Amino acid sequence: MNLKILFVCACLWMAVLVFGSSRNATWGEEPVPAPTPPMGWNSWDAYGESVKESDIRASAEWMAKNLKPFGWEYVVVDSGWYVTNHSAGFNAQNADFSLDAFGRYTPAANTIPSAKEGTGFRPLAEYVHSLGLKFGLHILRGIPKEAVAKRLPIQGSQFHAQDAADTADTCPWNPFNYGLDTAKPAAQAYYDSLARQFADWQVDFVKVDCISSHPYKGDEIRLLSQALKRTGRPIVLSLSPGPAPLDKADEMARYAQMWRISDDQWDVWQSSEAFPQGVNNQLERAAQWAAHSRPGNWPDADMLAIGRLEPAPGWGEPRASRLTRDEQRTLLTLWSIFRSPLIMGGNLQLCDEWTKSLLTNAEVIAVDQHSKGNRAVETTNNSALWLAEPETGAGYYVAVFNRSDEPQTLRYAWKALGLKEQEYSVRDLWEHKELGSAAELRVTLRAHGSVLYAIRPFLNP
């Protein structure tokens, strides 16, 4: 071979190696799922179990037009998509289901009409993909009780549903399924068949419920994770509900990309009788979990209960979010400095300009998507202080929270944040405004208010 050709080939190969080394994965390695916190919309907070295909399509269209340029991409259908008689009520004992011949839930054709020909969610997923977005769904861990009662075969195996089921294990707040007996090969076979179904439907995101708390089911997490990986399709695995046990953080990180750190987060400032979770209460939980955030692993503070929670929210009456505007900014500020997944819960079709402004602030989103070293510096009963750094470039991100029911002025020396004592230039990321230089951090906040700043060492001209 001509030496010149050999030289050119060698140069090209070196370029490939250098380029490959700069990516999330190198040759021979799998790409990291969810390298940044997932961003999207989930149907639960607005529609509960009543969501219809027309709602999903319209929400996806709105997201593609208004939110996609800012990084929002997942459209997730939450609980109940396989229930054919929603009038029976939430998690009703007399619910009727749509099942295939292998004991797997399929979309109810009366609410997801594109599934009528046995195509499942594939037509809807393809439509969502055509908009440049990704498609997700919610499942309950385990196997349908109806599949066990009918002794249905498990696709791709010699087993039947009763071989996989642990009939002594039912989710304490949803009676639809039995848990799986993870000591039996049939359990893995069932989750394998479920994962193949999802891959065939072109699913990109699976939220699995009753698995990370109430109770924690580590073996089922492992089996489902293995099943999804075997499909060869990159599918984000999101674990619910919370609070996930902190001592299981490393185990969850091996098998999932997201896990809930609290009970359901709704539009309340303070928890009442432990449910739902209040925004204020997330400050302690986020502080505990911050060290466990990394590419592919994101402790999840739950959905953003902002905007219009209607027509049939999963908790409470139809309403506008009860969080004040200050509390809504505080929610987004905490979620971003903590690097939680950002999953909008409100009705996108009814999204007002204020809510849209919260979801399309590129400077705030950049903190969530591209920061490092995120940590709580101080958490007291009346305030909280967080610090992070941009992934690239100089400076820091600083968030200050007023947890008090009264306005207050908070002052911190820069050394209290572990920073060098000097002047820093300060930019307000919510207001897109330069605030000048400061020899200390001093903020005056309304009740439940917050600020999110970018700071850099001040250089005199």
Per-range role (PLM):
Residues 436-461:
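C-terminal beta-strand-rich structural cap/linker in extracellular carbohydrate-active enzymes
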Residues 133-148, 229-246:
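Aromatic-lined carbohydrate-recognition surfaces of secreted/lumenal glycan-active proteins
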Residues 330-378:
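Catalytic cores of secreted or luminal carbohydrate-active enzymes
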Residues 329, 335-338, 343-345, 379-419:
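Carbohydrate-binding surface patches
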Residues 163-169, 182-183, 189, 193, ...:
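Glycan-recognition surfaces
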Residues 9-18:
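Bacterial N-terminal signal peptides
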Residues 38-43, 73-78, 83, 134-139, ...:
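Structural recognition of the beta-strand scaffold that forms the well-ordered cores
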Residues 64-210:
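Aromatic-lined carbohydrate-binding/catalytic grooves of carbohydrate-active enzymes
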